[in-house]
């Protein structure tokens, strides 16, 4: 049953945010989306985010410019002098970490939530097999507290904004299974950190995506071999 409320989803164009978008369509009355241009090497993901939000039929899709992240040095996603590794994720934070990225993104999404009086903000983080610090439950609860403490809407209406994270505690394969049940068009999603068409198939996010499909007995649509 749908909740009689609204939500704004952080949509990157990748697998997890697509699954969250389709789940939100099922669970909420009004669904908005926001994507971010932050100087990422894989900026092509925004084209896929647009296609996904159009197919999902969201109320509105915002593209937020985040220029200050474009100057972040040391992250392979934004620093042109740092190569995207051809390896799986390490145990600790990888070189593809953009410091405070999700905190920046949630803050921007919260601004839209305040303006449009949206009660929920959705982010498709899954902490079990993610090496990123800002995909953990501790981060989500702290971000939610900060959003509510600074929200004009909350101050006026006395209701809370919830950071909706239904995939927290799941693996990427778990999220994929949910997306398949919901009918997510995975052929319209994109996950490669190198920003190539077709995806490189070698970077950590490509590898994790390919492995998730293998785990459910399927081939990634991007790498499906002709029979």
Swiss-Prot record:
CDD domains membership: QueC-like (cd01995)
Q: In which pathway does it act?
A: Purine metabolism; 7-cyano-7-deazaguanine biosynthesis
Question: Which SUPFAM superfamilies does the record cross-reference, listed alphabetically?
Answer: Adenine nucleotide alpha hydrolases-like
The free-text cofactor remark is: Binds 1 zinc ion per subunit.
Provide a GO biological process annotation: queuosine biosynthetic process
Tell me its EC number(s), please.
6.3.4.20
Keywords annotated in UniProt = ATP-binding, Ligase, Metal-binding, Nucleotide-binding, Queuosine biosynthesis, Zinc
User: Which top EC class is given?
Assistant: ligase
Q: Which domain of life is it from?
A: Bacteria
Matching InterPro entries: QueC, Rossmann-like_a/b/a_fold
**Catalyzed reactions:** 7-carboxy-7-deazaguanine + NH4(+) + ATP = 7-cyano-7-deazaguanine + ADP + phosphate + H2O + H(+)
Binding-site residues for ATP, renumbered to this chain: 11-21
> What Gene Ontology molecular-function terms does this entry list?
ATP binding; ligase activity, forming carbon-nitrogen bonds; zinc ion binding
Names of required cofactors: Zn(2+)
Which residues does Zn(2+) bind? 192, 200, 203, 206
Q: What does this protein do?
A: Catalyzes the ATP-dependent conversion of 7-carboxy-7-deazaguanine (CDG) to 7-cyano-7-deazaguanine (preQ(0)).
Q: Which family does it belong to?
A: Belongs to the QueC family.
Q: Which named protein is this?
A: 7-cyano-7-deazaguanine synthase
- The protein's organism comes out as Persephonella marina (strain DSM 14350 / EX-H1)
Q: List the lineage, top down.
A: Bacteria, Pseudomonadati, Aquificota, Aquificia, Aquificales
